[in-house]
């Protein structure tokens, strides 16, 4: 194989690796600031009772969140999703049940997990990705 034909393949393979690793980034820490185009939030640590994650996409994009079925109790544990543009009184509170899909109206959304300290932590998974404002999920 000539060196000239090997370079495009090397570039292609390195690009595919970069894309696949970027899409698998997420957070299992208690809170944080996520600016990836896609990722996940997962929490299962027992000590912290309140965690807040802020997800930010590029301007002109909105965020799609897929919240997998939860095993949280309504009063003692909850997961809240807030949309930056919607205002402080407009949020989704999820306590359990089926899979939820939430579409933000702006490029910033906040996910908050809270529980009473006398209850053990319950794991959950939230997947997110960004799409252009005019696109449908």
Curated annotation (Swiss-Prot):
Expressed in which tissues: Seminal plasma or sperm.
Annotated keywords: Disulfide bond, Fertilization, Glycoprotein, Heparin-binding, Secreted, Signal
Location(s), subcellular: Secreted
GO molecular function annotation: heparin binding
Gene Ontology cellular component list: extracellular region
Alphabetical list of SUPFAM superfamilies matching this protein: Spermadhesin, CUB domain
S-S pairs: 30-51
Listed Gene3D superfamilies: Spermadhesin, CUB domain
BP GO annotations: single fertilization
Sequence ranges assigned to domain CUB in this UniProt record: 30-131
Glycosylation-annotated residues: 36
Region forming the signal peptide: 1-21
The protein's role, per its UniProt record: Inhibitor of sperm motility.
UniProt record similarity statement: Belongs to the spermadhesin family.
Protein name: Seminal plasma sperm motility inhibitor
Organism whose genome encodes this protein: Sus scrofa
